[in-house]
Amino acid sequence: MAIEAAALLVIDVQVKYMEPEPMVTSDGPDLLEKCGGLIDAARANSIPVIYIQHVDPDAPPDPELIAIHPQIAPNADEPIVQKTFGSAFMKTELENVLEQRGLSKLYMCGLATFGCMNHTVLCAVCRGYDVTVASDGHGTSPEAGPVDEQMAHFNRMWERAGATLQKAKEIEQRFAT
């Protein structure tokens, strides 16, 4: 039985952020595996999957680089919401997509912890959505500082803001109940 009014948002897991050097989780280079597990569990339990895709407004789009990573590619019936700002809510169709489908509980995974994940989580909480973040299912660049410290910092901040934090495997199990 699907969780009522729930959706999985997969944020910016695009080729340009995963190749040649992937953004990583505190467990290492396993973001695609964790997001893929969440996607598979959502699909198996009739929970809509919505992809968010960042497009740089100041650069000509390179279809190969901005594509959702092929390892977690969307099905033909799964929406891809394009954005040009950090938040998936700012000047996009995301709220319309959620409203049309009656979705108010959002599970999130993706990139980048310090950027688009952060902005999207906080905007969703401020808009009154029930937000659960995969605490080990968001990734960042080691160049921005120690990955485990970055993830722990943002996880604490999101929890203080009102989001729920669960490991990706726990969310997969939740989807199945």
Where are these regions (language model features)?
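A short alpha/beta connector and helix-capping loop motif
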Residues: 22-50
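Active-site-adjacent betaalpha module
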Residues: 2-7, 33-40, 57-177
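Short acidic, Gly/Ser-rich segments with clustered Asp/Glu that frequently serve as metal-coordination loops
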Residues: 16-20
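N-terminal nucleotide-binding beta1-loop-alpha1 segment
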Residues: 8-13
